[in-house]
A protein has these predicted regions:
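Long, charge-rich alpha-helical interaction segments
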Residues: 159-214
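Compact nucleic-acid interaction/catalytic patches
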Residues: 97-161
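Phosphate/adenylate-binding glycine loop and adjacent helical scaffold
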Residues: 20, 26-33
Length: 273
C-alpha cells in the first residue's frame, strides 16, 4: 500500500485492544492489521498548518504556523496551564472559542501510564485523552464546571501525585497495576481542605466528586516492546521504517525505534505498507 497525503494523525477507539487508524486526509486506514509487518513513513519535505493550511518551515505547538500559534486561543499558554486562564480579564484571544471549549464541563482523572498521574480533559474527550496518553488504567474522580477551575483542582492534586507521563517508561513495558480508587480516596483525604476551599469559591455544583465511577482497564495492540528506546526524528532523517511491533498512545513502536505521530501532525508524509 502506498498512501501519500498532506497530514496524518492517529484515530483511536476504546476496544480490547485499542483500535488505531491512520487518518489520511479524508480516509482512514486501520493500523492494527499492520502490526508484525514492515511499515515505512517518509517525510516529503512540506509542513502545512493544521488551522489555515499555510506552508511553514517549522511546526509550532504541534501543527501550527507561527502566525496561528501567536493568535489562536488553542495555542495560548493557558492550554498547557489552565489555571492561568485570562478569559475573565477580557484578554482571551478568541472569546467565542473559549466559551465553547473552556467554559464547559471538564473531568479531573487519575491515569496509570508510566505510573499514577493526575490530568484534566473536557468531558467529551473521555476516554480519548486516556488512549492518547497510553494509560493502562484510568478513573474519573471529579467533574468541574470550567477548564480554569479544573486547572486549580489539578494544581492542588499534583502536590501529591505526578501530572506528567514518562514516555520512555511508557514504551518499556506495562505499568504495574494500581488501585486507583484507593489513590482517589487518599487524595480526597489529604487534599480535602483545599477542595473545600475551591468549592466555597466557585460553588458546590462547580466541583463535584465522582465517587461512584469505576476504573477503566485499557489494553494496547503490542506484540513486543522495543529492546532499546530510540526515537525517530523526521527533521533529521526523513524516513522511519522497520517492523511495526506495537502501538501505544501516540507512539508507533518499531523493532528499529519509536515515533510520536502527534509531533508530525502537520507534516506531509508518504506511508508504505
Amino acid at each position: 500500500v502506498d498512501r501519500r497525503q498532506r497530514q496524518m494523525c492517529i484515530r483511536d477507539s476504546l476496544e480490547a485492544p485499542v483500535q488505531y487508524a491512520f487518518r489520511l486526509d479524508d480516509q482512514e486506514i486501520p493500523v492494527n492489521p499492520l502490526i508484525g509487518k514492515s511499515l515505512r513513513l517518509e517525510y516529503l519535505g512540506a509542513i502545512h498548518c493544521t488551522h489555515c493550511g499555510r506552508k511553514t518551515k517549522t511546526s509550532f505547538s504541534q501543527g501550527y504556523c507561527y502566525p496561528c500559534m501567536q493568535k489562536l486561543a488553542q495555542c495560548d499558554i493557558c492550554i498547557m496551564s489552565p489555571e492561568r486562564c485570562h478569559y475573565d480579564a477580557g484578554t482571551c484571544r478568541e472569546p467565542s472559542w473559549g466559551e465553547q471549549f473552556c467554559m464547559t464541563d471538564h473531568v479531573v482523572y487519575l491515569a496509570n501510564s508510566s505510573g499514577v498521574k493526575v490530568g484534566i480533559t473536557r468531558g467529551t474527550q473521555v476516554p480519548t485523552r486516556w488512549l492518547d496518553q497510553g494509560a493502562s488504567q484510568a478513573l474519573p474522580i471529579l467533574r468541574v464546571a470550567t477548564r480554569q477551575q479544573s486547572g486549580f483542582v489539578e494544581d492542588l492534586l499534583r502536590s501529591q501525585v505526578a501530572d506528567k507521563t514518562n514516555w520512555r517508561a511508557l514504551l518499556k513495558g506495562d505499568a504495574a497495576p494500581v488501585d486507583l480508587a484507593a489513590v482517589r480516596d487518599q487524595l480526597f483525604d489529604s487534599c480535602g481542605e483545599g477542595l473545600l476551599e475551591l468549592q466555597q469559591r466557585f460553588g458546590l455544583q462547580a466541583i463535584q466528586p465522582l465517587s461512584d465511577q469505576q476504573p477503566v482497564e485499557i489494553a494496547y495492540p503490542i506484540e513486543a516492546y522495543p529492546a532499546k528506546i530510540t526515537s525517530f526524528n523526521l527533521d533529521k532523517n526523513p524516513i522511519a521504517e522497520g517492523t511495526l511491533i506495537g502501538i501505544k498512545g501516540q507512539y508507533l513502536m518499531f523493532d528499529t525505534g519509536v515515533i510520536n505521530i502527534r509531533k508530525y501532525t502537520a507534516y506531509q508524509l508518504a506511508v508504505y505498507a
